[in-house]
């Protein structure tokens, strides 16, 4: 098949993956309005076309936390990444490393920290949740530091798991889930051979290393459900600072006041994010939340953004709305599931080309020249105020 965009990878991934895995990453919370709004709102951000600007010396390079990035993109933490391709975290990290951008390893990765870190040249980032088991958190931080991880991404929008109705229908959860997953795997031989048989062990590597025993999918669901901590507060972040002296990014900010709190706390960065629409349906899309947050804290803290980004044009839009860098989640996972490391590498090349086109036609020679001035104001920052119901279609 012809691959020219992330949407092509999504279609290919749907054919390759058992339904329980495809819908786990593709779906969102409740009726998935926020999931779809993430994409729809971002698509409504209109850019000013500028011409005759001599764009021959255009550059996408940027700096974040004293790291040089070839473009303002990093791969987001994604749980169970190693179930989408054989040792998926290793393959995705290699593609990001070759492109000169950061890879973020999830707490609930299949491949443990110690397997991924030695395979790449640049330091990877590590993502952590606040969990009841503080011993695990401390252990994970110590291991991340020992492995040379440079930046901690601290996810704060999961004090409790979101209600994801698709999971019950697809076999990730619900009645007879294990049997349904087995038969789905049988019906998807490419995945069954590449990942099901040759991608073992299917442990949650970071958790298994701490518990001293294998942890499979059922353990993943049960352990996390029992360990998410609804008592999370800024005091927990103070505790984390005792064990982590590198850059610390707070992921899951949607309100300007929370962004100001992150500045007061002394965080190095925030991620404007609604967890890809997977936590609470009906909240603002990241594109709609970002401008007010940028107005509140731009210049005081690094602003990253995710949710709804599917191409290089979307990256430029997010930066114009106020982000310094973006995180890619679903987009790279579709590519990984389709073609492994090569798929992710190709996706990143596509995004780079799309960014160059968008910057050339908006007159921005560098990332620093992308700003609110790049927007058509009536159609840029002023996005629709209401979360009106949308037709249920392609949520990619």
Swiss-Prot record:
Biological processes annotated in GO: aerobic respiration; lactate metabolic process
Annotated transmembrane regions: none
Keyword annotations of the record: Cell inner membrane, Cell membrane, Flavoprotein, FMN, Membrane, Oxidoreductase
EC nos: 1.1.-.-
Chain residues that bind FMN: 106, 127, 155, 251, 306-330
Pfam family, one: FMN_dh
Gene Ontology CC: one annotated term: plasma membrane
Molecular functions (GO terms): FMN binding; L-lactate dehydrogenase activity
Superkingdom field: Bacteria
Membrane topology listed for this record: Peripheral membrane protein
Record localization: Cell inner membrane
SUPFAM superfamilies: FMN-linked oxidoreductases (SSF51395)
Catalytic activity: (S)-lactate + A = pyruvate + AH2
Cofactor: FMN
Annotated positions binding substrate: 24, 129, 164, 278
Catalytic machinery residues: 275 (proton acceptor)
Chief location bin: membrane
Family, as annotated: Belongs to the FMN-dependent alpha-hydroxy acid dehydrogenase family.
Known function: Catalyzes the conversion of L-lactate to pyruvate. Is coupled to the respiratory chain.
Protein name: L-lactate dehydrogenase
Species for this entry: Salmonella heidelberg (strain SL476)
Taxonomic placement: Bacteria, Pseudomonadati, Pseudomonadota, Gammaproteobacteria, Enterobacterales
Gene expressing this chain: lldD
């Amino acid at each position: 098949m012809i691959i020219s965009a992330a949407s092509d990878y999504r279609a290919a991934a749907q054919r390759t993956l058992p339904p329980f895995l495809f819908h786990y990453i593709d779906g969102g919370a409740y009726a998935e309005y926020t999931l779809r709004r993430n994409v729809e709102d971002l698509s409504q951000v209109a850019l000013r076309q500028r011409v005759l600007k001599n764009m021959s010396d255009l550059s996408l390079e940027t700096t974040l936390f004293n790291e040089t990035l070839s473009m303002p993109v990093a791969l987001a933490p994604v749980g169970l990444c190693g179930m989408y391709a054989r040792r998926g975290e290793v393959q995705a990290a290699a593609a990001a490393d070759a492109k000169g951008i950061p890879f973020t390893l999830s707490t609930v990765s299949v491949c443990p920290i110690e397997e991924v870190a030695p395979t790449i040249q640049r330091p990877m980032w590590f993502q952590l949740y606040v969990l009841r088991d503080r011993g695990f958190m401390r252990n994970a931080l110590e291991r991340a530091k020992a492995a040379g991880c440079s930046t901690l991404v601290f996810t704060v929008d999961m004090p409790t798991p979101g209600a994801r109705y698709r999971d019950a229908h697809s076999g990730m959860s619900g009645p007879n889930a294990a049997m349904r997953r087995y038969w789905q795997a049988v019906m998807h031989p490419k995945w069954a051979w590449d990942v099901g048989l040759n991608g073992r062990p299917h442990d949650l590597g970071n958790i298994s290393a701490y518990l001293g025993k294998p942890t499979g999918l059922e353990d993943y669901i049960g352990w996390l459900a029992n360990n998410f901590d609804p008592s999370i507060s800024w005091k927990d972040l103070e505790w984390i600072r005792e064990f982590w002296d590198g850059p610390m990014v707070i992921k899951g900010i949607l309100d300007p006041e929370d962004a100001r709190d992150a500045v007061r706390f002394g965080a190095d960065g925030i991620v404007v994010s609604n967890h890809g629409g997977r936590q609470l349906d009906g909240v603002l899309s990241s594109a709609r939340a970002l401008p007010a947050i940028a107005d509140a804290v731009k210049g005081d803290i690094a602003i990253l953004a995710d949710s709804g980004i599917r191409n290089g044009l979307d990256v430029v839009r997010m930066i114009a709305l106020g982000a310094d860098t973006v995180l890619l989640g679903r987009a790279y996972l579709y590519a990984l599931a389709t073609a492994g490391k090569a798929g992710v590498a190709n996706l990143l090349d596509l995004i780079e080309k799309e960014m160059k086109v968008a910057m050339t036609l908006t007159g921005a020679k560098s990332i620093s020249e992308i700003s609110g001035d790049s927007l058509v104001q009536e159609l840029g920052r002023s996005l629709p105020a209401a979360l009106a119901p949308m037709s249920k279609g392609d949520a990619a």
